[in-house]
Amino acid sequence: MAQTIHFIRHGEVFNPEKILYGRQPGWRLSERGQEMAQVIGDWSAALSLGAIHTSPLQRAKETVAPIVAKHNLPLAVDENLIEAGNIFEGKKFELGNGLLKHPDMWRYLWNPWKPSWGEPYEELISRMLKALFFARDNAGDKDAICVSHQLPIWILRSAVEGRRLLHDPRKRECTLASVTSFHLDSEGMIESVSYSEPAKHLLPAKK
């Protein structure tokens, strides 16, 4: 039987200082992020789910909570869904007063194809595929939800669709609380990908 594994990016994080939080613990959703999570929970009500998985990070767990509340299912924490590793976490990364102002950090930026600042794309793809198929197997004949993070979701989708992994981060199609759905065939293999933004009306205005 065909299945769909929905990968959801977490909602907006409370981060007034614009810090790269990465895998740091304790980053919670903003009020708007909590609204996004409620919208995603309502969106999920129509689904027939057999598994709900999440990244271990707080922002992902807060995003998945309304989904769990809509379905009588246990929540599984999967380390493979965690944010991409990044040596810059805990710092600002912006022109002017951020990391780009400090030459000692430039050595990490020279080769985005094999990012020296964090987790190699190949490793990211491998663990995200493991997460996808783990959710598939846990769901039985039903669909599944995995709550994760922008870069892991986007790189997984790019690999599946044959897109170049080297990319402009500003052009990723993976907004806050968005849904990237991997549709599987009767053999459990990825057949196609679709994308939607149930919480689009809550997205911050682009500057």
Enumerate the predicted regions with their spans.
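Conserved histidine-centered catalytic loops in small-molecule metabolism enzymes
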Residues: 48-80, 101-107, 183-207
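Short, active-site-adjacent cap segments at secondary-structure transitions
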Residues: 14, 59-61, 84-85, 152-154
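Short beta-strand scaffold positions
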Residues: 54-55, 126, 147-148
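Acidic, low-complexity terminal tails and accessory targeting/binding regions
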Residues: 1-3, 76-77, 83-97, 140-142, ...
